[in-house]
Regions:
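Active-site-proximal acidic secondary-structure segment that organizes catalysis
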Residues: 44-117
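Short hydrophobic "helix-edge" motifs at membrane interfaces and signal-peptide entry regions
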Residues: 60-62, 150, 184
């Protein structure tokens, strides 16, 4: 059977000339893992299942590859290392597979205990919520769950030109305000973050500040990891926050993007990353303790994760496994350039949590430089996004 003949697989997201909103990962759960795949720690313990599972669905003109694992096993860059090694091995290039590091010692703890640079206090500590504020934050979050139960997870295809227009719009708005002089740097990630924050702010029933929660990857922040001479297939992400006032969040893209750039630049320095790690090492309970939340207790929490650096479309090459067939017009529609290359990918939790909302997963670019984003949002926010994308 061809993939377009399958009632579910034919609806997998495809690249479009204009921006589009398409079905989310939950519509394709059957292709991700077997029906009884472990979804909790208890499931892994009682089923004696392996930490990493592979689920293959084959069609005459396409193959769907599903990987499932607990997030404690690895992050997106660990997944990149795994898929890169897999591609090299299939091509008979085992000698090029990087050395696997960190199996017997924790390089992150070692870096925290032996800093190579100046020691600083954690700047986020000044914004950490006190007990009373944390209670207010929890009560507000609980109220939001009760009054806004409906959320929808969808996938967005954003053409290269659309994202570049967002970035240039942000830069132009800052230049018009004569901010930061002439040398204004706003990344595509900053622009997309600002775009998501603004959509949530404009769809909020009342003005509220927003705290964007980012995943900051240690592999790019600590010299001992950058120059390690191999790869770490594990989770090396810590939290970073962007704090946006209610007024700024509902305003122009430029100031939001600039604040995101400023906050992340401040928190991503080696001394600040080490300060964060030292606090975790000194009090491991902070990993699960809600007191690590920072910012305004009245803020809307908006988690972001950006996978663009993983460059899955560039490093995944399963062409040695292709038995026959050539690229078709359908391959081009899906963003593929050669048989055995990645045309689309997404991620989902095998266990849906009712508290998941206001989440953006920037999955990165396809072969045509289109950006793909999966988001879990309230219907009013989706209305704002569709209007902004020019869909309605």
């Amino acid at each position: 059977m061809a993939i377009e003949q399958h009632p579910e697989a034919k609806n997998l997201p495809k690249a479009t000339a204009d921006a589009s909103v398409q079905p989310g990962p939950q519509d394709f759960r059957t292709f991700a893992a077997r029906g009884d795949a472990p979804a909790t720690l208890e499931d892994f313990i009682h089923s004696d299942s392996p930490m990493l599972s592979l689920h293959i669905t084959s069609f005459t003109d396409a193959t769907l590859v599903g990987l499932s694992w607990p997030h404690a096993l690895m992050d997106v860059m660990g997944q990149r290392a795994l898929l890169d090694a897999w591609s090299l091995a299939m091509a008979g290039r085992e000698s090029e597979v990087p050395k696997l590091l960190g199996a017997h010692e924790d390089a992150v703890i070692a870096a925290a205990e032996a800093p190579s640079g100046p020691i600083e206090e954690l700047k986020l500590g000044a914004k950490r919520l006190a007990t009373t504020s944390m209670i207010w934050f929890g009560a507000r979050f609980g109220w939001d769950l009760l009054t806004s139960k409906s959320v929808e997870t969808r996938t967005i295809c954003m053409p290269k030109r659309f994202v570049e227009e967002l970035r240039q719009q942000a830069i132009a708005e800052l230049a018009a305000e004569h901010r930061e002089g002439r040398d204004i740097f706003i990344s595509e990630g900053d622009a997309l973050t600002a775009w998501g924050i603004r959509a949530i702010a404009l769809s909020s029933p009342q003005p509220r500040p927003i705290t964007a929660l980012h995943a900051l990857n240690l592999r790019f922040r600590l010299p001992s990891l950058i120059d390690a001479g191999g790869v770490y297939v594990r989770n090396m992400a810590i939290a970073a926050c962007t704090f946006v006032s209610a007024e700024t969040a509902a305003g122009d893209l430029g100031p939001i993007a600039l604040e995101n750039r400023r906050c992340l630049s401040e928190q991503a320095t080696e001394p600040q990353v080490l300060a964060f790690l030292r606090e975790l090492c000194a009090d491991p309970a902070l990993v699960a303790n809600p007191a690590v939340f920072c910012g305004d207790p009245n803020a809307i929490l908006v988690p972001f994760t950006n996978w663009t650096k993983a460059e899955f479309t560039k490093i995944i090459d399963f062409s040695p496994a292709v038995l026959s067939g050539n690229g078709t017009d359908e391959d081009e529609k899906r963003g593929s350039r050669r048989p055995g290359s990645l045309t689309f990918h997404h991620a989902q939790s095998l266990r849906e949590h009712p508290a998941t909302r206001n989440v953006f997963v920037i999955m990165g670019k396809d072969h045509s430089e289109n950006y793909w984003v999966t988001a879990t949002l309230h219907p009013p926010t989706w209305e704002v996004i569709e209007k902004n994308l020019g869909i309605v």
